[in-house]
């Protein structure tokens, strides 16, 4: 299972939101490039970027920062947030991003996502952000009546690289991932699933291993890394590809 550190960009700073609330912002770093390099140095095999300004407004506010991060790293970078047109998606891919993540457009224009996946094999990810099982869009500001599992199933044959399943209710809370929701999403789709939201400790990461046989291939970790609740090197050693048979014993795994 791949451990993917996250950098959320707001006004070119590295931040985290609590349950997607733009009024509840914690700033962790004013230098996202340095932060990205730090995650790479600690063993990250991929970086997850979110343009929060773009997600909210649809405008490419943080492009210079995105380009700087992509240029500085040797590992693949994936980006989501405000990517709502074919031209915008392919512009970002031309920056050197490995993959782009489409959320709002996946529910509003699913055919566009499928077209992009055909034009850019292996480089399109669908982001499904849900609260109480219903898909949220436009930076989590708008709530739809579409079931997250139904949307996941719709993209089974679309040729996308993966689905990122974010549980809004747990995102940024450190209270643990929604395993029931993730299992339902994995069962609904044959596409590799990346879990996002709620990871607060190593035990949470270990709990996700039970879902690996169902198709959960990775997990995005944000606040737990910044708060020091999870050590990236240790997480990769215990959970990542080539992991040990036994979890590390340097810290207690259960509270």
Curated annotation (Swiss-Prot):
EC identifiers of the protein: 5.3.1.16
Catalytic activity: 1-(5-phospho-beta-D-ribosyl)-5-[(5-phospho-beta-D-ribosylamino)methylideneamino]imidazole-4-carboxamide = 5-[(5-phospho-1-deoxy-D-ribulos-1-ylimino)methylamino]-1-(5-phospho-beta-D-ribosyl)imidazole-4-carboxamide
Annotated GO biological process: L-histidine biosynthetic process; L-tryptophan biosynthetic process
Broad enzyme group: isomerase
Coiled-coil stretches: none
Pathway: Amino-acid biosynthesis; L-histidine biosynthesis; L-histidine from 5-phospho-alpha-D-ribose 1-diphosphate: step 4/9
UniProt family annotation: Belongs to the HisA/HisF family.
Protein name: 1-(5-phosphoribosyl)-5-[(5-phosphoribosylamino)methylideneamino] imidazole-4-carboxamide isomerase
